[in-house]
């Protein structure tokens, strides 16, 4: 079974590129290194979030590299990606997670 990750985040592409990837999350290192894709969905709850689409809209799918950077001062991880495609799928977060509170969810890639 191949896995990907669904992320509920507020950053835009430029901010992710400045971070060096999709970060910073408390994910399992070994599991994160084997993820295929990340689907980014928009979270608008933070003051600094990019307000470009409705809450929960899937905005981007990223091909992950398997490279995971660890923050110096915590166990948070940043997932590097090699390519991406912009998408616009309203309510993706709500539909795929039942609006769960945890800001990411591992998903089977083929589902």
Report the location of each language-model feature.
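Structured alpha/beta reader/binder surfaces that contact nucleic acids or chromatin modification marks
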Residues: 1-111
């Amino acid at each position: 079974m191949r896995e990907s990750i669904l992320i509920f985040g507020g950053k835009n592409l430029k901010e992710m590129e400045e971070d060096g990837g999709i970060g910073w999350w408390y994910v399992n290192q070994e599991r994160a290194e084997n993820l295929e894709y990340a689907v980014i969905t928009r979270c608008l709850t933070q003051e600094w979030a990019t307000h470009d689409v409705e809450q929960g809209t899937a905005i981007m799918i990223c091909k992950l590299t398997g490279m995971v950077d660890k923050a110096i001062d915590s166990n948070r991880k940043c997932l590097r990606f090699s390519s991406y495609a912009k998408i616009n799928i309203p309510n993706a977060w709500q539909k795929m997670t039942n609006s769960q509170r945890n800001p990411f969810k591992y998903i089977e890639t083929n589902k």
